[in-house]
Amino acid sequence: LAFWDAPGRNVTGNTRIPLLRMHEIGDYQVPMGLTQGYTQLIEENGKGDLYRIAYVESATHCGFNVAESAVAIETMMRRLDTGSWGPVDPASLNALGASMDAGVAPRFIDNGPWTVKEYNRIWRPGTR
């Protein structure tokens, strides 16, 4: 646990920079509940204006395709250039990815039925 509490780790939800999290709904290494827990920490720290999350229909860990990766880069560049988030809903992200002619279709989806009712982990970053 000390590893996650070390300075420089951004697991407490107190981000100081814009952050787009991409998460695959079937990620076997980082369950959906952990993303919800991080979102809860972001909100508790009043940092919701700096944070967005995009879910991808995939059962891998960091197996984003080239279209999804390009969408993430473009979304962050737009956020950094303009100071505000553009649309980050699945339909908008999929349309952006399709417009890039990457040779593969982006797979952004709503988190829907994969949402857990509440963050259900005993340990939270910054606590002992």
Give the residues covered by each predicted segment:
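C-terminal His-loop and adjacent cap/lid subdomain of alpha/beta-hydrolase
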Residues: 1-128
